[in-house]
Amino acid sequence: CPLHWSSYNGYCYRVFSELKTWEDAESFCYAQHKGSRLASIHSREEEAFVGKLASQTLKYTSMWLGLNNPWKECKWEWSDDAKLDYKVWLRRPYCAVMVVKTDRIFWFNRGCEKTVSFVCKFYS
């Protein structure tokens, strides 16, 4: 992996402390290295590795992952089977943030327009 990037299972990772929106962070990752994107996480071990990197780099360990709009395929239905013909959703897309605490790691959704740190990943 290049200087300042860390290797894990054939991929290179780097946590950035700059605060960016999800879209700006994704663009920033893309510009860093060929194939680089916001990180996807595929196992508890990979999550722990990224969490350790974040703990070493960030004061507040909250960062964008590559997951966005996780519910866009969701089909909403009324419990009484009535037709969904009226909606007043707040039309804000959501993206995934990973938070690292001393005793656990968790993900939550956050408005993509918010600014947080982020982690990039590419296949080496």
Swiss-Prot record:
Main localization, broad class: secreted
Top-rank lineage group of the source organism: Eukaryota
GO molecular function, one term: toxin activity
Originating species: Calloselasma rhodostoma
Disulfide bonds: 1-12, 29-120, 95-112
Expressed in which tissues: Expressed by the venom gland.
Keyword Disulfide bond: yes
Keywords per UniProt: Disulfide bond, Hemostasis impairing toxin, Platelet aggregation inhibiting toxin, Secreted, Toxin
GO CC annotations on file: extracellular region
Subunit record text: Heterotetramer of subunit alpha, beta, gamma and delta; only the gamma and the delta subunits are disulfide-linked. Alpha-beta heterodimer and gamma-delta heterodimer associate orthogonally, giving a cruciform conformation. This heterotetramer may covalently dimerizes thanks to the gamma subunit.
Pfam families according to UniProt: Lectin_C
Span of domain C-type lectin: 8-121
Compartment annotation: Secreted
Name of the protein in question: Snaclec rhodocetin subunit delta
Family, per entry: Belongs to the snaclec family.
Function, as annotated: Potent inhibitor of collagen-induced platelet aggregation. It acts by binding to the integrin alpha2A domain and blocks collagen binding to integrin alpha-2/beta-1 (ITGA2/ITGB1). The gamma/delta subunits mainly contribute to this activity.
